[in-house]
């Protein structure tokens, strides 16, 4: 299913963004 692939990649993208914000908050 393309939906499953999209959801998986979207979830991964959100995790990357969240991780980046988390690291930024620690470093700054």
From Swiss-Prot:
One of its GO terms (molecular function) is type 1 vasoactive intestinal polypeptide receptor binding. SMART domains: GLUCA. InterPro entries: Glucagon_GIP_secretin_VIP. The modification Asparagine amide is found at residue 28. GO terms for biological process: adenylate cyclase-activating G protein-coupled receptor signaling pathway. Pfam families: Hormone_2. Gene3D superfamilies: 6.10.250.590. GO terms for cellular component: extracellular region. Keywords: Amidation, Hormone, Secreted. It is found in: Secreted. Belongs to the glucagon family. This is Vasoactive intestinal peptide. It comes from Didelphis virginiana (North American opossum). The lineage of its organism: Eukaryota, Metazoa, Chordata, Craniata, Vertebrata. The gene is VIP.
């Amino acid at each position: 299913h393309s939906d499953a692939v999209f959801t998986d990649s979207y979830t991964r993208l959100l995790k990357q963004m969240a991780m980046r914000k988390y690291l930024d908050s620690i470093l700054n």
